[in-house]
Every structure is written in C-alpha cells, then in structure tokens.
C-alpha cells in the first residue's frame, strides 16, 4: 500500500484555500493535516476561524487548529493559496526551510527558475528545480500554476503547438468567482460586462509564452509568438470562456487541428494521476458549445473544452475554449502539479 503524504495549505481561510480543502477531500495520496492562515486566525479551530462559502465545511478539517504561516511544524508539501500581497516572502521562507511549495499565487510565476506548470503541456519544465535550488541555496522548491484564464488558453493551444503557433488573439469572458469573495459588487456585474480585470491581460500574454516555451537545458525559451489578450468579467458564476484566433507557420488543415485536439493526451493521462481527466481537452461538435453552465463542471472540472473550430479571415483558425476557473484554474491545477511531482519521485 502506498504511503500517504501529509500536506498543508497556506492561506487556508480564504476562498482559494477553501477550494483546496474541498478538492483534497478523499484524495488517494494526500492527507490534509495542517492549515496556515493569518495571525488573527492562528490558534483557533478552523471551523471558528473562517466563514465557509462552499456548502458544508468538511468535518475532517473543522476541528483542526489553524497555525501561523511560518515554517516549523508544517508538512514538507504545502499548497499556497496566499494573497499576492503577502505570498512572496512567506513562500520563500517555506522553500528556504526545505518545504515544497506548490503555489496558486502569481508572485513567482514569471521568475526564470520557477516552473509555471500545466502538467499535460510542459511537464519537462520541472527540470528547472535543481537550478532553482542551486541558485537560491535552498533545499526546498517553489512550483506555480498559471492564472485561471491562462490555463484554459494553454490547454486548448497545447495540442496545436506542433503546427508552429506564430500569433494568438484571445478574448476572455471570465466568471465572477475568479474575483474571490465577496468579489464584484452586484450592481457592477448584474446585467453587465466589465471590460477590465487588473493585470489579467499582461499575465495571460506573458504566461502563455512561458508555458508553451521549450526547456533548453537550464532555462525556458519562451514561445516566439505574438500574444494579444483582452479580458472581461461577465455575470457567470463559474467557468472562464476564451475565444481564440491563431496563426500557424505550418498551415495545417482544419482536420489536422481537430485530430490533434481529439487525440491529445499528456503525461498525467499516461500515468493515470488521480486528478487527471481521461481526456484533458474535449472537443464539442455542437454549434453552441461549450457553455459554462452546461460544461464547466464536467470531468470534475479538470478538463478544458473546445468548440466552434473554423477558419479565421484574419489569422488562420478560431475557436472557443472553456474551463472551470476555481478547479482546473486554481486548486485542482496545483494538486495535479503535486501529483506529477510525486510520480517523478520529487516528493520522496
């Protein structure tokens, strides 16, 4: 029987932390035994330290005592749901103390020695870790998952990289849950579209180039494609939709692209990792799909859905992509990253 691995969560009382807790319930490999939060929550029982927003708080964690977000009694593997305002120093302190930090926070994503991981797309980027440890003089490590909308975009584009992507134009329709809790004021979003999400467009553009880039022995060579993103907040609860136009150097046919999407599998599928969907990218042939309400929670929220593939009069082809922003776009992504690391022997 496989030895179970104790894990902790940094920022456990916030919305992202709660999604981590929910996703880890019943995990076949990981036991959630430690919860870290702010000083005002430390020392309290978890059930008394936060307001739970996802149904009923799991009994397995309600009685756990919340700790300060400091290395010491935390398990070696910690998931970070820290707010960006405090994540940088806390995550570094844990890595310096020998912890493996799998982070959902944005703070370290674009650092050259930190993997920005989508396990089906760029698992070889984990090879950055030895260089990270040497350069920073620590035995721990920091691994990040991308912005929630970037994950949807790169999962859809990953199978198509073989055709030589040269230009990408992406427009997002992003769910309100992506803004956290309490999120966007109802008077701002009901019956409305907000055509601005702070720093989101820059993150999508830069992160996409890094994720789809190639590992070159000691560094990542970013994808040499021009990427333009426009991000909008819409009155949808869960599920980010991205409309995408792409130009290719190889000039594939529509049939080539469709075959690449439908046949695509990655390392998580080959190794049957617990949180990996059997088909990471699912093509939907219906003219009006994918849709957040109908599709975002399929495959436990861990797949990306693509539809409406057709020629583009400006670039080469265009399509629609969809993914669950708080599952595959956040907690589920980080847990799958840790599963990949375990399958590589990096948690031993």
Q: Each predicted region: which residue ranges?
A:
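Charged docking surfaces used in two-component/phosphorelay signaling
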Residues: 177-348
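N-terminal Rossmann-like NAD(P) cofactor-binding subdomain of oxidoreductases
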Residues: 1-196, 219-220, 226, 304-305, ...
């Amino acid at each position: 029987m496989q030895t179970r691995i104790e894990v902790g969560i940094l920022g456990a009382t916030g919305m992202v932390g709660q999604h981590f807790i929910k996703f880890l319930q019943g995990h076949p490999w990981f036991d959630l035994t430690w919860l870290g939060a702010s000083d005002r929550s430390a020392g309290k029982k978890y059930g008394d330290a936060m307001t739970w927003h996802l149904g009923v708080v799991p009994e397995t964690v309600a009685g756990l005592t919340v700790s300060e977000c400091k290395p010491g009694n935390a398990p070696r593997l910690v998931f970070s749901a820290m707010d960006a305002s405090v994540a940088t120093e806390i995550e570094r302190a844990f890595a310096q103390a020998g912890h493996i930090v799998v982070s959902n926070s944005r703070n370290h994503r674009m650092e050259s020695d930190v993997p920005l991981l989508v396990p089906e797309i760029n698992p070889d980027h984990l090879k950055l870790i030895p260089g990270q440890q040497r350069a920073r003089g620590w035995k721990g490590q920091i691994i990040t998952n991308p912005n929630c909308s970037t994950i949807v975009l790169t999962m859809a584009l990953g199978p198509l990289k073989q055709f030589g992507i040269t230009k990408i134009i992406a427009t997002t329709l992003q769910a309100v849950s992506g803004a956290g809790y309490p999120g966007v004021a109802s008077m701002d979003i009901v019956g409305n579209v907000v055509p601005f999400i702070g720093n989101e467009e820059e993150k999508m553009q830069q992160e996409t180039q890094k994720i789809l880039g190639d590992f070159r022995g000691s560094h990542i060579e970013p994808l040499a494609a021009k990427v333009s993103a426009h991000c909008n907040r819409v009155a949808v609860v869960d599920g980010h939709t991205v409309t995408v136009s792409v130009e290719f150097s190889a000039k594939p046919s529509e049939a080539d692209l469709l075959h690449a999407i439908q046949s695509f599998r990655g390392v998580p599928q080959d190794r049957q990792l617990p949180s990996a969907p059997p088909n990471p990218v699912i093509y939907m042939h219906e003219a009006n799909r994918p849709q957040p309400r109908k599709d975002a929670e399929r495959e436990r929220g861990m797949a990306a859905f693509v539809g409406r593939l057709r020629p583009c009069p400006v670039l080469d082809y265009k399509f629609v992509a969809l993914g669950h922003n708080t599952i595959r776009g956040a907690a589920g992504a980080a847990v799958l990253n840790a599963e990949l690391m375990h399958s590589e022997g990096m948690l031993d």
